[in-house]
Amino acid sequence: MGCQTAQFKAHLKPGFHLVKTEVTLGLCSLIIKEEEKMADLRLLACFAHPDDEAFPVGGLLASNVAAGRRVRLLTTTLGEEGEIRQEGAATKETLGQIRRIELSCAVKALGLESHELLEYRDSGMAGWDANDHPRAYINANDYIVIERLVREIREFRPQVILTFEPGGLYGHPDHIAISKHTTTAFDLAADPTAFANQLANGLKPHAPQRLFYSARPKGFRLEWANKLRAAGEDFPLPTTEQLTHGNPPEEIHLTLDLSAHLETKMACILCHRTQVAPSWPYHRVPREVAEWVMGREYYIRARPDVPPGENVSDDVFDSIAPD
């Protein structure tokens, strides 16, 4: 007999989908069960600014959404100290609110389940006057931020958490701060003595299983520039300081080819109009060049430690059972 789609949809939790509708009743039940399992795999991504979810990790987020995993994003600031790369896209006074709108667009482009904005202020790069702003994220009380992140973990109960590597990709103070706060929250969320007030209010300790850091290999900026220049783009070579950015290649556990999700990642990036200059080259270069530069992402598995000889799976949820 035919499967009654509407009847089954009424019993699915938020975020679950039916893969097929024209199937037998028995198969329909099996498909729902599989989709429920996939939907019970959860990833929490914790970053500092609008566009942090786009440029370095957009492919991984898109691939997990496409696989039916539940993906939630937490962003700590509005990126008020970012550049305005499109003339007329914003003013210094309006940039934060414009970037709020851009972030909402990016979340929809990636298909994320939900998003939380903590609304600290962008601290700017090290040495900027913005470092001294009382609302700057780097001046936030560590206890308060970590308590909030532990609450996020205990509420959403992710098996996998994603943030920046401890150096913040290129030394951005906010990137370094979110890495520190997220790592500490990962380690504390399972401890019933940590933030016991949360347990008194009905939350339970939760032990996420894996923590991944977004990273880039040292020398990546020069590789990118050479690739784009070879494709005919007048792309600037990195500065001496930029050549120092990145992690030693041996520290990176995963180099992922996520080019199958390049269109989704590019759509997410282009939501951040204030951050994409008219000279942005990736929509002009040949597809294989865009795939090489934008379709590759790099990750370090920070928890659990990777013992010598272990090959880290390309699937960040590999062998994790839904719960």
Predicted regions and their residues:
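N-terminal hydrophobic alpha-helix used for membrane targeting or insertion
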Residues: 2, 9-10, 40, 163
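Short hydrophobic targeting helices and cationic amphipathic motifs
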Residues: 4, 12, 17-18
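Intrinsically disordered, low-complexity segments enriched in serine/threonine/proline/glycine
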Residues: 7-8, 20, 31
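Residues in and immediately flanking transmembrane alpha helices
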Residues: 17-20, 62-64, 85, 187, ...
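Metal-dependent de-N-acetylase/amidase catalytic core
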Residues: 23, 30-33, 37-44, 131, ...
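Active-site rim/loop-helix segments in enzyme catalytic domains that contact anionic ligands
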Residues: 30-156, 183-184, 191, 300-301, ...
